[in-house]
Every structure is written in structure tokens, then in C-alpha cells.
Amino acid sequence: MINRYSRPEMANIWSEENKYRAWLEVEILADEAWAELGEIPKEDVAKIREKADFDIDRILEIEQQTRHDVVAFTRAVSETLGEERKWVHFGLTSTDVVDTAYGYLYKQANAIIRKDLDNFLSIIADKAKEHKFTIMMGRTHGVHAEPTTFGLKLATWYSEMKRNIERFEHAAAGVEAGKISGAVGNFANIPPFVEKYVCDKLGIRAQEISTQVLPRDLHAEYFAVLASIATSIERMATEIRGLQKSEQREVEEFFAKGQKGSSAMPHKRNPIGSENMTGLARVIRGHMVTAYENVSLWHERDISHSSAERIIAPDTTILIDYMLNRFGNIVKNLTVFPENMKRNMGSTFGLIFSQRAMLTLIEKGMTREQAYDLVQPKTAQSWDNQVDFKPLLEADPEITSRLSQEEIDEIFNPVYYTKRVDEIFDRIGLGD
């Protein structure tokens, strides 16, 4: 992933140095397991643990000849050892090392993502509580519907991210796995003890059955969950973009002193962070498709998945880490304009209270059809002529014969729409 969208801690996990360190650890742990079984002299394993190392340039040099990165790696490591070098890669096939190391790298990446998710959820919770009763316009189809609160909008984000966290924990466990079962997965040249020993030491699970590779449905699910997280962020970002439009200006991304919004128009303050999230979510969903394409391999294995995973594994985890942190800061520092929200509610002449007017008339004895057919023409008159809805109700004897002035006034009270907010917050775990 390019540096622009990378954070150092996550990027370092996918560095060549860290990858080869993981490979080397798998190799050494496998030898330790063999030694536990009495198949390899423990003194040789001790020498391997002490002296085994690699030089990346040397690996690449050897690979120019071998055209096989694992063979190049094992030969480069062997050059740093004495006679004990014969135990390097003993009983292993390349993917025993690569897939198990991948499981270990995913574990490292997931630890960062887990912290990111927890921090992001906390930011949303704080902002939702802050604006729990900040009344604003609810919109459906882009059209004014009925009042809601900005806190409730944020609460839907909170609930969605909680579900994403649950999905993430399940999917993360799937890819934090290793396999050391040999060339076709039948343990012909290596006992299951070695697999269990290595995986236990790495803190990952041993996959119960494999071919030459771990089953890639595990990875497809994992990348699908990361895509779900990215898409949730995109949904939230799209909301901010919509609410920041000049004619609404209900929220605004923080705009720093000296920041520029356009090379041509000095007045511009664009929601570039949220737009950035939309673009990156598209990339991650594309990687999800690639992960699903990787499931169908020939027989016990081919390497069609390998080239793709060298890209999507680092890029997707790096991007999710970046997105959670950047969008978390956007939400944390978001400027909210309650007065603009109030102003916008009034821009549709009180029509947003039409359902309540209809329901109140039903409560006073009208059928639903009668009430609907009485109210709807007045909404059309209000909208078409750009006049307030309330006076049209007050001028109709059929309505005033059923409703007092106080009851009509109450219909147009936006606070009515906040009466269940506490209950909803309690239901999703955001109650005080």
C-alpha cells in the first residue's frame, strides 16, 4: 500500500523483514517440535535457534536463479548455519511455512484492527451521547420525512459497528490459523504433533484439515468482514457528505487553519476525508471479490491465490487500519450546527408534521381514510404555494371542530419525536 494511506505500525507487519522473520520462526519451531519427538538432536536445534538468520538481498539474489522464494529463503538461511543446516525445512512443504506465517501475521494485524475498532466505537458512542437530543430533520428518499435526532443517527452507526466487531472476531479466528500437514495435507512426512506445537507457540490454531494450503473460504470470509467494516464507514461518510452540502450545512468536517479546499475557489470547504473513505471502501470491496476468487483452487493446491494475496492481505488490513483511525478523527472533531438543523426543519413549512395531524384526527374519531384524505390536499396546497401548513389546518372547520388550538399547537412540537430516544439508547447499550 502507498504511504499516503499507511500507518507505520500496520505497515511494518507486512514488511519483508517481518515476513521473513515469521517464516524463520515457523522453521525453527518446527525443528523444536521434531527435537521434542527425538527426531532431531536438541543441540542442533539450539544452534539453529541461536545462529539462523537471513539477508534479504541474498534471498532475492538466490531467487533470481531458483525462481522460488521459499527455496531461496531456506538456502539463504542455511548459509548462516553449519552442519545443522540439514534440518532446515525438514519434512515441510513451502506452504506449511507460508500459510502458517500468514496466520501469525494476520494475528498481529488483527490485534491492531481490534484496538482500532474499540477506539472507533468509543468515539461514536461519545458523539451519540453528546447529541442524543439534538433535533434534526430525518430524510427518506432525500426528502424531508419526520424529525429525529443527530444522536439517533449516530446510534445506528454504533449498533452497526458492534455487529461488525462480532463478525470480525469470528472471521479473525478463521485466518489466525496454521497448517503443517505436508505436500497434500495427509501428514505423510510430518506428524500432526509438529503442526500443533508450532501453532501453539505462535498463538494461532491448527487447522483441523487442509490440503497443501489452508482452505481459502476462511480468508474469503475475513476479507468480506473487512469489506463490511469499510462499507459501514462509507455509509457514515456518505451521511456526513450529504449533511455538509452548502444548502444544508448541518455538520462539517473540521477545517484547520491554513487548510485549502480548492486551488481555484478560496471559499471551498469540502468533505474530503469522508470522500476519501468512499474511495477506499471501493478498493477494499474489490479485494473482497479477489478473496472469493481465491477459494477455488485446483485439486490439492495451485498458486493462483498467491500473487493476489501478496497484494490484498497487506493492502486491505493497512487500509482498514487507516480508515478506522482517520474517520474516527473526523467523527471526533465533527462540527455540528444545531441551529441549521432547526432552520432546515422549518424549510418545508411544517409539512413534516402531517402524519401526526392525521393520527390526531383518527384519535378524535375519523377513519384513517377520512383523515388522510382531509390532510393530504392541505399538504399539497402548502407545498405548491410555499405557505405554512399549520394555518391551513387552523382554517378548516372540519378540523377545528375536532381539535382545540392547544391540540393543533402540540401537533407541531418537534420534541414529541424524541420521547423514545432514551429507550432506544438503552436497547443498544448506550444508556447512562
From Swiss-Prot:
Keywords: Lyase, Purine biosynthesis
GO molecular function, one term: N6-(1,2-dicarboxyethyl)AMP AMP-lyase (fumarate-forming) activity
Biological pathway: Purine metabolism; AMP biosynthesis via de novo pathway; AMP from IMP: step 2/2; Purine metabolism; IMP biosynthesis via de novo pathway; 5-amino-1-(5-phospho-D-ribosyl)imidazole-4-carboxamide from 5-amino-1-(5-phospho-D-ribosyl)imidazole-4-carboxylate: step 2/2
Keyword Oxidoreductase: no
EC number: 4.3.2.2
PANTHER family, alphabetized: ADENYLOSUCCINATE LYASE (PTHR43172:SF1)
UniProt family annotation: Belongs to the lyase 1 family. Adenylosuccinate lyase subfamily.
Name listed for the protein in its UniProt record: Adenylosuccinate lyase
